[in-house]
Amino acid sequence: MRSSDGQEAGRPAAILIAGPTASGKSALGLRIARAFGGTVINTDSMQVYADLRVLSARPTADEEAEAPHRLYGSVDGAVNFSVGHFQRQAAVILSEMAPDQLPVFVGGTGLYFRSLEDGISDLPEVPEPIRQQIRAEAEGRPTEALHATLTLRDPKTAQRLRPSDRMRVMRALEIFAATGRSIGSFQETRLPGPLAGRPLLKVFLSPEREILRRRIDARFVTMMENGALDEVAALRDRRLDPLLPVMRAHGVPGLIAHLDGALSREEAVQRGQGDTRRYAKRQFTWFRHQMGEAWHWTTPEAAWSLAEALLSAPVGQ
C-alpha cells in the first residue's frame, strides 16, 4: 500500500519496519542502520526479554555489533513488560539520540508501533505486592469466575471484556485493587506518541504466505539446533508465573511440556511451528485492519530501495 500523506516527499525522521515473524525485518533494519548511521530499536514484545535470545530470533551478538541496537534483551523475564513500558523507553531513547542519528524501529508488535504515533492510555503502575496478591487469589480459579468478580467491582469494564479473556480481566482487577478506580477511567487520558506528527517511512514486509510458512517451520528447527531447548529449560527452572508474557512466547509452552514428559520432541516442535504460523496470520490481519493506509506493504528489497532513495536525497527535496 502506498502512503497517501506525502511521506515520500522528504527525509523521514524515523523508519518503521513491521511485518510477520520470519519476514526479514531484522536484516533490513540492520542494512538501513549500517548504511545511514541508524540505531535499531526493538519493537517486538518478546525480543525485549533477556531469557529468549534464541527462541525470539533476536539479532546475534555479531549483528548487534554492526550498528547500535536498543531494547534487545534488556528486560528480565519476571517483568510483565507492557506497551506503556515500551513507549516510555522508546521516548527516552529518542531523546538521547543525536540529531543526525536515524531511529530504525523493527519488530512485529502492532500495539508498540501504534503507541509511537497515537500514544497510549495513561495507566498507572501496579505495585508488585498488589499484582502478586491478585494473581495468588486467581490461581486455580476459572477465568469466568474472575470475570464475575470484576463484574462486582468494575461492572462497566466487565461488560466490555470477554469472560474468557484472562489477561485483560486480570489487568482490570489489578488496576482496581491498586487505585480503587475503573481501568476505563484511566483509558480516557492518553499519553502522546513520541513520533506523533513527524515524517515517517513505514513499511510492512509481506512475503507470500507459502514462502513464509516454510521459513517459519525451518527457522524453528534451526532454533532447536541452536539451543532453544536449553534456553527454555533455564526459563522453566525459574518457576515464573505462567501468565507472564515470557512464559507464553511461541514455542515456550510446548517445549516445557516436552521437558515435563507430556510431549515428544517432535510434537513440541510441531506445536511451536503451528503456534508461530497462526501468530503470523494474526499479524497480517491486525496490521491490515488497524494501521491504515500510510504503510507500504512490500518486500525487503523494495523497502530498501525506497529507504535508500529517501535517505540519500539532498535535504529539502
From Swiss-Prot:
It comes from Methylorubrum populi (strain ATCC BAA-705 / NCIMB 13946 / BJ001) (Methylobacterium populi). It comes from the Bacteria. Residues 44-47 are annotated as: Interaction with substrate tRNA. Keywords: ATP-binding, Magnesium, Nucleotide-binding, Transferase, tRNA processing. Belongs to the IPP transferase family. The keyword ATP-binding applies. Substrate binds at residues 21-26. Its EC number is 2.5.1.75. This is tRNA dimethylallyltransferase. GO terms for biological process: tRNA modification. NCBIfam families: miaA. GO terms for molecular function: ATP binding; tRNA dimethylallyltransferase activity. Catalyzes the transfer of a dimethylallyl group onto the adenine at position 37 in tRNAs that read codons beginning with uridine, leading to the formation of N6-(dimethylallyl)adenosine (i(6)A). The record marks 109, 131 as: Interaction with substrate tRNA. Its cofactor is Mg(2+). ATP binds at residues 19-26. Monomer. It catalyses: adenosine(37) in tRNA + dimethylallyl diphosphate = N(6)-dimethylallyladenosine(37) in tRNA + diphosphate. It is an enzyme of class 2 (transferase).
